Regions:
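Domain-level signature for soluble enzymes in the chorismate/prephenate branch of the shikimate pathway
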Residues: 1-225
Length: 225
């Protein structure tokens, strides 16, 4: 990690952290800085330690929160930690005009941090796997998928991105429970696969992998440490 990225973290007034699956982020942060993340006790949403405020939020919301708070409090140094896939999901949303220019972010994968898994297209056992592999190839009509990553899905077939033919709609965009609905409806799902245990235990098949996911540092674009 460069001194710039290290300074981003150590000079931050507020650091936003995921409130679930915290271990990869705490481990990565401890390996590159001297920051000690305090334990979150009871139902407190934030803790102050050594001049910094630590706030726990949903990991998927970190990019938007960092951009919004930094825009509202320009004199503060706001930094977050999130999965790299949520950063891409947020940034791809900006391409559709949903995000104001002062809500743009930058992110940096933490070097040497362990992979958190990969975003992949998975199919339940009720689906003809080989037929679906052909249908999601570039050049075919986009196949609808159930997902928590609608922007990744919609942009997956565009030039320079993942080159897969999939899409999504609001009724198939969830905040969780993707595999269950995919199984019930006999549809493909686009989701984060960590260890693969859920995929195996529920007889899903991985059709294609879109990207590896790593712990990432999130800042507002143009922020100067």
């Amino acid at each position: 990690m460069s001194e710039f990225e290290k300074k981003l973290l150590e000079s931050a007034d507020t650091i936003y952290l995921p409130n679930r699956y915290q271990e990869p982020f705490i481990e990565a942060l401890g390996n590159i800085t001297n920051i000690k993340i305090p334990d979150l006790k009871d139902r407190k949403l934030s803790v102050k330690s050594n001049g910094q405020t630590f706030r726990w939020v949903r990991g998927r919301d970190v990019p938007q929160i960092v951009a919004s708070v930094q825009a509202a409090q320009p004199k503060k140094r706001i930094v977050g930690l999130s999965g790299s896939e949520w950063c891409d999901e947020y940034m791809l949303g900006q391409l559709t005009g949903k995000v104001a220019t002062n809500r743009m972010i930058e992110y940096y994968n933490i070097p040497f941090a362990k992979s958190m898994g990969r975003v992949a297209i998975i199919a339940p056992q009720s689906v003809d796997v080989e037929q679906m592999r052909e249908k999601i190839r570039p050049g075919q009509d986009p196949v609808p998928v159930i997902t928590v990553y609608p922007n990744l899905a919609k942009n997956s077939f565009k030039e320079g991105l993942f080159r897969l033919s999939i899409t999504t709609t609001p009724e198939f965009t969830l905040s969780g429970g993707v595999e269950s609905l995919a199984d019930d409806l006999g549809m493909l799902a686009l989701d984060l696969v960590c260890t693969g245990a859920t995929v195996i235990q529920n007889n899903f098949t991985i059709l294609a992998e879109l990207q590896e996911v790593y712990p990432a540092i999130v800042t507002a674009r143009g922020y100067d440490a």
